[in-house]
A protein has these predicted regions:
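Charged, terminal alpha-helix-loop-beta segments
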Residues: 2-176
């Protein structure tokens, strides 16, 4: 190849490939060799934003295990078989169980109803066992059929779009 000063410059295929790979890595479009692409926890973002906006000064727990602990010395081993609720909020008159979904699906209703049964058996929440328990799904997207089903189970549905909604929608729904 000729350069502007009249000298000849040779660029190998390997140099072009290396430069291209460097640009793709810098843009975040590919991952370095041997490194797995990080999985985005979309629900963690929606839960954080929602709780900070609506319950900043209210006692709440996130990613909390619910259910009884088996008695005995090996109870820690069984703790991994317990269920995990996205959030539990202590409201003035009740406990509120929340599941966060970017796209709500019908199975979230069964999930919440199961957690509702397990919450009073959770050691951390024994002192609240006599309070009513409400269930809520907070979702960024939900179709009409799923919405009707969730509500028919006595579960509240609240629509809430977090800051990462457009990115999630593009990657997961439009598959771009």
């Amino acid at each position: 190849m000729g350069s502007s000063d009249g000298t000849t410059t040779t660029t190998t295929v390997q140099e072009i490939a290396d430069a291209t790979i460097t640009r793709l890595l810098a843009a975040g479009l590919i991952q370095p060799k041997g490194q797995k692409q990080k999985r985005v926890n979309w629900e963690r973002q929606i839960s954080y934003e929602y709780l900070q906006r609506f319950y900043p000064d209210v006692p709440h727990w996130t990613r909390i295990e619910v259910g009884p602990m088996p008695p005995g010395e090996n109870s820690f081993l069984y703790s991994r078989t317990r269920r995990w609720a996205d959030a539990v909020v202590r409201e003035p008159q009740n406990m509120l169980l929340i599941e966060f979904k970017m796209k709500a699906m019908p199975d979230v209703a069964a999930q919440l109803l199961n957690y509702k049964d397990l919450l009073p058996q959770t050691p951390l929440f024994y002192k609240y066992k006599d309070l009513p328990i409400k269930c809520r799904v907070v979702a960024a997207l939900c179709d009409d059929q799923t919405s009707k089903f969730i509500k028919s189970q006595g579960i509240e549905l609240e629509m809430f779009k977090p800051m990462n909604y457009e990115k999630w929608y593009t990657e997961k729904i439009l598959k771009k």
